[in-house]
Amino acid sequence: MTRKGEDTEATMSPASVSILWETPYKVIEFPKLVDGKAYFYHAIGTDDDEKEFFNHGNALLGAFDAAGNLLWSWHLWCAEFDPADEQVELGGEVMMKRNLGAGVVSGTSEEDILASYGVYYQWGRKDPFVGPRYYNMADSADAQVYDSQNLRVYPEYAATDAERGSAGYASAHAMTFITGTKESGYNWLQTADASLWGTEKNNNDPCPKGWKVPSKEVFAALHIKDVISPELEKNYGFTLSDGTNEAFFPGAGRRSFYTGALTNMNDNEVRPTPWTGYYWSSTGEGKEAYAMDFSFDINGTRAGSSFQGAALQYAAGGMQVRCVKIR
């Protein structure tokens, strides 16, 4: 029997495992199932020129039954860092300094800005969706991802309805971004369920073992530490503080609750949309859930910013997650 997540009681009997998607450069290879356990290869070491390498990135590994139905999936986050060395006491909790799925904390190059975004989650779902292909979200293009045969694969987008609007369907269709409708209150669920993440860690919580999605109270305790500065403009984000400690949060945009498209900034010269950051909390309320959001203008002709530590957002939206330690 194979375990689902961290719950020792939630088991299954898969027939195979396979890569649903992974970011470029073969984050993992050769997945196989042996005696109910999933194995895979991750390359790390030195190349022919004796240069050290580590395959950074994200992957989604799926377990399937004999008919090819997806039974469960695991997000594999491969990053060269130790959370114990990159954490900060913030808002009353011990928080990671980088977004879930991110390759770096922050950066000024286009490559590092993009790597700092991490992956995107619909509220209450355990499986991530990839971020943009370009740091500025040009054409709303998704990052390129590949399956076990190294073939390009793409996320699917489908509106919630009586069939798709359930946690069971979402788990069995991990690559389908379930968009909200007016009738659903722009929730991907047909019947809202605030317990999918909640205050206690469960199998839907996407954070690594020992970590969880923070409650709304954590973000509500934060504020913008500095006004817009040239340095912040280079990093595309804000340093947030609880009055004692601080951490950087990239303005990584979000996926639309209505279309699933990646959005952050448009080219309207009259009223340019500022760069934005959206971070889910674990706190749901009715058909919506609380998130932290901020925006800042990098137009250069004016300075402006906004910040909400805990505001209700449509649950079908895809946003970042910043994990806190369970203690």
Say what each PLM segment does.
Residues 1-201, 315-327:
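Short, compositionally biased
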Residues 60, 102, 180-327:
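C-terminal, surface-exposed recognition/capping segments
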